[in-house]
Amino acid sequence: MAEGSAVSDPQHAARLLRALSSFREESRFCDAHLVLDGEEIPVQKNILAAASPYIRTKLNYNPPKDDGSTYKIELEGISVMVMREILDYIFSGQIRLNEDTIQDVVQAADLLLLTDLKTLCCEFLEGCIAAENCIGIRDFALHYCLHHVHYLATEYLETHFRDVSSTEEFLELSPQKLKEVISLEKLNVGNERYVFEAVIRWIAHDTEIRKVHMKDVMSALWVSGLDSSYLREQMLNEPLVREIVKECSNIPLSQPQQGEAMLANFKPRGYSECIVTVGGEERVSRKPTAAMRCMCPLYDPNRQLWIELAPLSMPRINHGVLSAEGFLFVFGGQDENKQTLSSGEKYDPDANTWTALPPMNEARHNFGIVEIDGMLYILGGEDGEKELISMECYDIYSKTWTKQPDLTMVRKIGCYAAMKKKIYAMGGGSYGKLFESVECYDPRTQQWTAICPLKERRFGAVACGVAMELYVFGGVRSREDAQGSEMVTCKSEFYHDEFKRWIYLNDQNLCIPASSSFVYGAVPIGASIYVIGDLDTGTNYDYVREFKRSTGTWHHTKPLLPSDLRRTGCAALRIANCKLFRLQLQQGLFRIRVHSP
């Protein structure tokens, strides 16, 4: 018998679910009861078992009897109302979430092992994070292992501490929780006085009970950042401050130290969004390097120097670099012997150390790497013998790799970015042909969809996603005129998800359209995107250029020494100011001015 063609009906699953839902509403074909708080809900065992691994396990270990009795599934810790909402979700894929019910739904989804529902709850919680609730959401997320939500809530707390410290939630913290919060290195306060004043407000909220915790809580204060004249002024005006300073011996009232002694004890709060470069090759010898450096364009605008960080465990070139959840991840690439690698490493900016990661399923170089909610997606590339279309995903919390659907085509040296929790693959080439096509991958449906193509076909470009926008910078193509094979730098392009089309950016001040320019990375920080590469301006080479999204204009960064490296991997990474300060001291990047008497 001849083989036929496989055909499918896209509405088949939806129709089936609607029919099953109507059976449930009419209590038809039900063969079990859920028992919650003494109330029974008729259900179909096979549907619940398919949806919930927890119920499936209960059925496997306690199978129905053949005596004709109604099978009962007892559940504790879930209310009838919430369970009905979850049953509606199981049969429709939709659920109503609000701030009053979200905690109960997460608890139920956690018990029933409904991972898809838990993911929807996480996305809802992400949109709820605010000054009034970020500490509570942070604690809740930690308890239920909602890792990405916990990271976002912590990041919000660090960034908006002054707003958070004025809320009722902050004033109701336990002494232990308060101490944990004010111990965070990255609190964005500018001056330690704001942390001190937050603690004063907390004590004053219930003075008689909290006085006994005064000394313990104040031990978490970074007293080196408190000005003695400010403290003396507060003591004159506030009896509570007088009592606290008298009780806590660690709070300084003497004149601050000067010179080297001051630097040795100084510990600045806050963080800096840094441009990090990793690996690549030495410009002169062309040997792969393990070097890692960072530059903080907003930390010290007048001193934009490169700070040396801990090097990789091995030299890498043509590797993938990405920051996620406060860490930096590096995978694949090639070593000094041009051997294609599958290994990976993770950088912890708090410890300034690297640790090894489980290797990728396939060794590859010149591949794409993007991140969505703590999941790292590795796309395409080459393995030294052939071009790859495979995709795999690394969960940074479970430390496991899973295979994903293949790319629909080879995109040699294409560019990739994430935007609105979807992955975009752009440009690239294969067998001498360059592409302008763009495809979008939705991890939920695991489907690739073609979208509006780029205005210019290109390879070797870099891309990034910011909010609802995609940016593609640089890349090269052959000149489309009688001059034939000469390569030129492509114009940068911009895509907005609402308008669904690509628009040229003004690249006049990025680089000249010659083949001598190469881009290595595009790093979004604040309201700007920093493009890193060998950027030929016509008169000299720049290593970093700033693109201001609000005005669509390019700007020089402060004067930088010419880089001795090329083809580096690039990313943005949030690093604590106190760590950067120590590194700058160790590397002699600070100089003390001693005023003559």
UniProtKB/Swiss-Prot annotation:
Tissue specificity, in the record's words, reads: Expressed in brain, heart and muscle.
GO process annotations (BP): cytoskeleton organization; proteasome-mediated ubiquitin-dependent protein catabolic process; protein ubiquitination
Q: What is its main location?
A: cytoplasm
- Quick check: keyword tRNA-binding in the entry? no
Start and end residues of the Kelch repeats are: 274-326, 327-374, 376-421, 422-468, 470-522, 528-574
Which GO cellular component terms, listed alphabetically, does the Swiss-Prot or TrEMBL entry include?
A: Cul3-RING ubiquitin ligase complex; cytoplasm; cytoskeleton; cytosol
**UniProt modification remark:** Ubiquitinated by E3 ubiquitin ligase complex formed by CUL3 and RBX1 and probably targeted for proteasome-independent degradation.
Keyword Repeat listed? The answer is: yes
Domain (BTB) ranges:
30-99
The effect annotated for R15S is: In GAN1; no effect on binding to TBCB
Q: What domain of life is recorded for the organism?
A: Eukaryota
Q: Where is the protein situated, by its record's location annotation?
A: Cytoplasm; Cytoplasm, Cytoskeleton
Concerning InterPro entries, the annotation shows:
BACK (IPR011705), BTB-kelch_protein (IPR017096), BTB/POZ_dom (IPR000210), Kelch-typ_b-propeller (IPR015915), Kelch_1 (IPR006652), KLHL16_BACK (IPR030579), KLHL16_BTB_POZ (IPR047070), SKP1/BTB/POZ_sf (IPR011333)
* Pfam families registered for this protein in UniProt: BACK, BTB, Kelch_KLHDC2_KLHL20_DRC7
Which key words are in the record? Answer: Cytoplasm, Cytoskeleton, Disease variant, Kelch repeat, Neurodegeneration, Neuropathy, Repeat, Ubl conjugation, Ubl conjugation pathway
Q: Impact of changing V438I on the protein?
A: Found in hereditary motor and sensory neuropathy; likely pathogenic
Pathway of action: Protein modification; protein ubiquitination
Check the UniProt entry and state the signal peptide residues, or none.
none
Q: Show where the BACK domain sits.
A: 134-236
Outcome recorded upon mutating R545C: In GAN1; complete loss of binding to TBCB
Sorted alphabetically, which PROSITE patterns does this protein's record hold?
A: BTB (PS50097)
Its Gene Ontology molecular function terms?
Answer: ubiquitin-like ligase-substrate adaptor activity
Q: How does it assemble?
A: Interacts with TBCB. Interacts with CUL3. Part of a complex that contains CUL3, RBX1 and GAN. Interacts (via BTB domain) with UBA1. Interacts (via Kelch domains) with MAP1B (via C-terminus) and MAP1S (via C-terminus).
The illness linked here is:
Giant axonal neuropathy 1, autosomal recessive: A severe autosomal recessive sensorimotor neuropathy affecting both the peripheral nerves and the central nervous system. Axonal loss and the presence of giant axonal swellings filled with neurofilaments on nerve biopsies are the hallmarks of this neurodegenerative disorder.
Q: Describe the function of this protein.
A: Probable cytoskeletal component that directly or indirectly plays an important role in neurofilament architecture. May act as a substrate-specific adapter of an E3 ubiquitin-protein ligase complex which mediates the ubiquitination and subsequent proteasomal degradation of target proteins. Controls degradation of TBCB. Controls degradation of MAP1B and MAP1S, and is critical for neuronal maintenance and survival.
Name of the featured protein? Gigaxonin
- Whose protein is this, by species? Homo sapiens (Human)
